[in-house]
Every structure is written in structure tokens, then in C-alpha cells.
């Protein structure tokens, strides 16, 4: 199997080491569409990350959870990242998965453009994704298609924009702390 290349970034070379090769090989057997679904595979700082095309996320998630040889039955966390310089792939969502059965840990990473920030929801695959998808929507603006109640969870319902994005204005709201006022970040002293 040839490893796909994305924007000049090749996959990490095989062998990956540890159980990573076994997971990658088992996944390739369990999911025949893997070469189409995976953009690249990275091993960095002791973490195995599969970069998944968003249209294959749900299928791959079901295989990772349900295949007896893999059994990634727990979604530990789901988080968003905004890379404004990664044109056409500005929004990333990272899924941390654990196999309690085999004591293994992997990550999935899915990217979407600002112009079309839709990624399939995995709430019905891993219920722990529920509030985490809502938080990622609230903070980054990623729309999780199929989520049963994609509403704001941290910010007020009428809050404009998504405050964790790097293009979000730093304005701020003046805060009073023990009688002293803290100005918004835009009005604070600049340090060179």
C-alpha cells in the first residue's frame, strides 16, 4: 500500500513502532476503503494520528468502534483547532480514541474549509461526543451534521461569532475586579 501525500507532507514512514503498525494493518483489513479515507498517517511524540477525509469519518468511526480486533469504544475528547493559513482546510477537529479492551490510544484528525465548515457528527457512535461537539461548534463554528441538539453550550445564545477562532476580534468586555477595571485586550499596554 502506498502512503498518500497531502500538500507535500508525507505520512510517517513504516514501521511506526509499538502497536501502531498492528492497528494500521488491522484497520486496512477491516476497512477496505482506507486508502480513500486516509489523507496521511502521522506518528509524532508517541501519538498515532490518522488524517481522515470528512466524508469517510462516520464509516471509519463505526469500524474503529465495532471491529473486534480494534474496539476503540471510548472517545476521550474532541477538540477544535483553527489554522487560518491552511487555506481550504482552516478548521480541524481532533478525536482522541481509546480501546479499553486492548489498552491502546489513537487520534483522528478531520479538516474542513471555513467556507463549508461541516463535519459529520459521531454522537451516535460515541455518546461522549455530545457536549464536546457542542463546545467545538460554540468556540470554532464547526457544524456537526446530524447532531441532535447543536446549540451553544458556553456562550450566550445571541453571542456573535466563535471566540476561539484566530480571526475573532480581541475586543472584549470591561471587567471590574475588586473595584479596579480591567480594560479589553485591545486597549491594554503593548509590549515589544
From Swiss-Prot:
Entry keyword annotation includes Cytoplasm: no
Gene label = nuoC
Q: How does it sit in the membrane?
A: Peripheral membrane protein
A GO term, aspect molecular function: NADH dehydrogenase (ubiquinone) activity
Gene3D superfamilies, per this entry? NADH:ubiquinone oxidoreductase, 30kDa subunit
Q: Identify the stretch annotated as signal peptide in this record.
A: none
Q: Which family does it belong to?
A: Belongs to the complex I 30 kDa subunit family.
| Family matches, as InterPro entries | NADH_DH_suC, NADH_quin_OxRdtase_su_C/D-like, NADH_UbQ_OxRdtase_30kDa_su
User: Subunit info?
Assistant: NDH-1 is composed of 14 different subunits. Subunits NuoB, C, D, E, F, and G constitute the peripheral sector of the complex.
Q: What class of enzyme is it?
A: translocase
Is the Isomerase keyword given for this protein? no
Localized where? Answer: Cell membrane
Q: What is the lineage of its organism?
A: Bacteria, Bacillati, Actinomycetota, Actinomycetes, Acidothermales
- Catalytic function, reaction form: a quinone + NADH + 5 H(+)(in) = a quinol + NAD(+) + 4 H(+)(out)
Q: What is the protein named? A: NADH-quinone oxidoreductase subunit C
GO CC annotations, alphabetized? plasma membrane
- Any Pfam family hit: Complex1_30kDa
Which UniProt key words apply to this protein? Cell membrane, Membrane, NAD, Quinone, Translocase, Transport
The EC number of this protein is 7.1.1.-
Q: Extract the PANTHER family matched here.
A: NADH DEHYDROGENASE [UBIQUINONE] IRON-SULFUR PROTEIN 3, MITOCHONDRIAL, NADH DEHYDROGENASE UBIQUINONE IRON-SULFUR PROTEIN 3
